[in-house]
Amino acid sequence: MDQPSGRSFMQVLCEKYSPENFPYRRGPGMGVHVPATPQGSPMKDRLNLPSVLVLNSCGITCAGDEREIAAFCAHVSELDLSDNKLQDWHEVSKIVSNVPQLEFLNLSSNPLSLSVLERTCAGSFSGVRKLVLNNSKASWETVHTILQELPDLEELFLCLNDYETVSCPSVCCHSLKLLHITDNNLQEWTEIRKLGVMFPSLDTLVLANNHVNAIEEPADSLARLFPNLRSISLHKSGLQSWEDIDKLNSFPKLEEVRLLGIPLLQPYTTEERRKLVVARLPSVSKLNGSVVTDGEREDSERFFIRYYVDVPQEEVPFRYHELITKYGKLEPLAEVDLRPQSSAKVEVHFNDQVEEVSIRLDQTVAELKRQLKTLVQLPTSSMLLYYFDHEAPFGPEEMKYSSRALHSFGIRDGDKIFVESKTK
């Protein structure tokens, strides 16, 4: 394939990691080594590259001199080539085949869908354990070729590739443990189940921002499809039924779930969402990134019982009966209004008289004095106020600070306020 005008991997490498742009840092495989050498010595005598190379967004279109790549990059283990202009797998192969220690490769946002990946090219990636192909529009045929030639691949990222379906290869990949396939257009469970067939050892499946609308699979079949799945993200999926949440219990090793932003949970409060999900998933120890403690689980399960206690029997979920067996039938919690009082009826004592007065608790002591001025026939400047809590073991408390708010005294109905004159 003809290469568009651009820059080579080696050109960018030498520019970015030149002595002028990459200051010396102590430590193995770090920084730049500049020995005293005669003019015209090989380039590899001028640079000592780090083991992690980040060359994203550099306009790279081709490999460059393969001998120089081999001389520079024998020790490199991680390579980020994302957001470049690589569109020929042969050029990628020329780079990777000369980086023998490479374990992590990021090719995101390169237009590689414009060429076919041949098995001979893919073979040069054989040591890679983590491969990122986000927004590369890599076809499933390309993915299958990669899976055939990368026997040690453990993590694969296929996000933003516009997949609407999943295509299974002829041979499954037993090495893969983590698959990120977020932000695609997968909607039907018939497509998602193929991932279980392709990757039987899968530990983590990230399906966020797809539109999977239901888990249409019998429980026993789910256990066979994903026997090792420990973590699943269905963040912003299209799930609309509690039955789909219950089916997550069919994954025999599932411990971690992400379920934010699904239509099913929209009508519920934040507290209800978490408690109802925790109660339905007894084996899940982490929900939406937060650990589920034993105390939270018990609170959630008790909440679940009370939530469904008045629901018709035909609508009660099966989990309700399991929890009734565990805790027994629970009475609804008493409703307690914890909002602070806005007013109180108090007894105002003055000149051997007692009057019941309703006072606003958001006002200050100075404002209360003005309210009482007419009643007690004293100017505010001559007024002394004492608050007496009828349940407190101590005597009256002088209300001496004019700017203090009445609610800070904890005034309640039935308490007493004594008014005296300073002239007494």
UniProtKB/Swiss-Prot annotation:
Main location: cytoplasm
The entry's keywords: Coiled coil, Cytoplasm, Cytoskeleton, Leucine-rich repeat, Phosphoprotein, Repeat
LRR repeat start and end residues: 73-98, 99-123, 124-147, 150-172, 173-197, 199-224, 226-250
A GO MF term: alpha-tubulin binding
GO cellular component: cytoplasm; cytoskeleton
Residue ranges occupied by any LRRCT domain in the UniProt entry: 262-303
Annotated coiled-coil segments of the chain: 350-375
Biological processes, Gene Ontology terms: microtubule cytoskeleton organization; post-chaperonin tubulin folding pathway; tubulin complex assembly
Annotated compartments: Cytoplasm, Cytoskeleton
Phosphoserine modifications at: 18, 41
Ubiquitin-like domain: residues covered: 334-424
Protein's job: Acts as a regulator of tubulin stability.
Name of the protein this chain belongs to: Tubulin-specific chaperone cofactor E-like protein
